[in-house]
Design a protein with these regions (language model features):
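Single conserved hydrophobic/aromatic residue that forms the stacking wall/gate
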Residues: 1-6, 10-11
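Short, well-ordered amphipathic alpha-helical segments that serve as non-catalytic structural scaffolds
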Residues: 8, 106-107, 177, 181
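Internal hydrophobic alpha-helix adjacent to the cofactor/substrate pocket in enzyme cavities
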Residues: 15-18, 148-149, 174-188
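An anion/pyrophosphate-binding glycine-rich loop and adjacent beta-alpha core
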Residues: 15-123, 184
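Short beta-alpha connecting loops at secondary-structure transitions
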Residues: 35-40, 160-170
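FAD/FMN-dependent oxidoreductases across multiple families
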Residues: 105-149
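Short FAD-binding loop at a beta-strand-to-alpha-helix junction that anchors the flavin cofactor
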Residues: 143-166
Length: 188
């Protein structure tokens, strides 16, 4: 049955609409580790851009936090495997407390709700699925292989991202390809 997550795949299957690059899945390196079920809370890479560092269980830095997402995620997975752990640690200690509370209020508050004060202690983080660059195959006007069906945004694969999307590019992609779809539609 179709669901809210991945429903485009269910629709695609039931109508034989072509799929492209189902293996193009972006993993975000830092989501808050929690034993609670449900979606993970994303810890923005801008926190690492401000100076937060990744630490292993011994409190040692193990990678350059400013590398591309896939490289940082791979380093985290490697460290977790080496330590037989289900997370690594992200320390915001290098960032001034006022900067944390003013620039990252949602992260600060959510971590407090989970029992972590990011101004006083590192938080457990783990990579998680973040964005799907594959999807329903479309042309440059967002037209699918099914007559009169268009797709734009994360549900479609138009090829602009390749296998690793850059941060924030998906918003522009969604707007551009939605406009292209509307411009191509015949409303008569």
């Amino acid at each position: 049955s179709c669901s809210l997550v991945g429903s485009e795949m269910c629709i695609r299957d039931s109508h034989n609409i072509e799929l492209e690059h189902p293996d193009y899945i972006q993993i975000h390196p830092t989501t808050l580790y929690s034993s609670k079920p449900g979606r993970r809370f994303l810890i923005s890479e801008s926190v690492r851009g401000e100076g937060a560092v990744l630490l292993n269980g011994k409190g040692e830095r193990f990678t350059d936090e400013l590398q591309p997402r896939d490289v940082v995620a791979a380093a985290i997975f490697n460290e977790m495997e080496k330590e037989n752990s289900n997370h690594v640690w992200l320390s915001l200690a290098p960032i001034d407390e006022e900067v944390i509370q003013n620039h990252f209020p949602n992260i600060y508050e959510h971590c407090l709700e989970e029992g972590y004060d990011v101004t006083k202690e590192p938080i457990p983080v783990v990579p998680a699925q973040h964005y799907f660059m594959g999807g329903v195959k479309v042309n440059m006007k967002s037209k699918t292989t099914m007559n009169n069906l268009y797709a734009a945004g994360e549900t479609s694969c138009n090829g602009v991202h390749g296998a690793n999307r850059l941060a924030s590019n998906s918003l522009l992609e969604s707007l551009v390809f939605a406009k292209r779809a509307v411009n191509d539609m015949d409303f008569d």
